[in-house]
Amino acid sequence: RVVKYSKSWERLDQASLRGANTTIPFDAGGFTCAEDGGLLYIRTSHEMYTSSDGLNHQASLSFTVHQEDMTISDAASAVSNPATGYVSHSFNQLMLVDQEGRLVALDHGDAYPRGASLYRCDGQSGRRGTQLLVASWPGSIGANVTGAQVTGLAETSTGYLTAYSYTGKGASSNLTADVKNIYLAYTSKDDFSQSGTR
């Protein structure tokens, strides 16, 4: 539930996302939001309904709240594909709306995909987009240990900066003993691709 308050803390309205393929909201992840043009974009994580393999998997969850009437649209809660920004498991979610009004998200994935996933909508939320890996971690699909922490997303006039730390060992990392190096990556707005990331 998203609750709208006045600046003097009067409760004005609310929006509720029901069902949404969710058994546990915010499971094993974070929460981020961004506001632009009367829209509140929300990205978090959730544990999903039992799948055909008998398990409840975790993934990213995103939706848009229209602040004027508190309606919800563009809820992305189902198992999907990279063109929708889907990440599973998604252990951290960061998001911004860029100067051109495009939604940009950064997730820490361990399976689909396994790495720091940068996603940009082709326009406002709800439209398809492009997903690329800023960094990838060795290990089997879904191995929770990645040896990484994905912690920063910012926009420049010409691109996007992403920050993460990484042991370099992927699933073989010893999280309490291994040294983590800190990385800052740049992805060009005009070449939003693997080759446009350095």
Please report, for each region that a protein language model flagged, where it lies by residue.
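Extracellular, repeat-based ectodomains that mediate carbohydrate processing or recognition
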Residues: 1-198
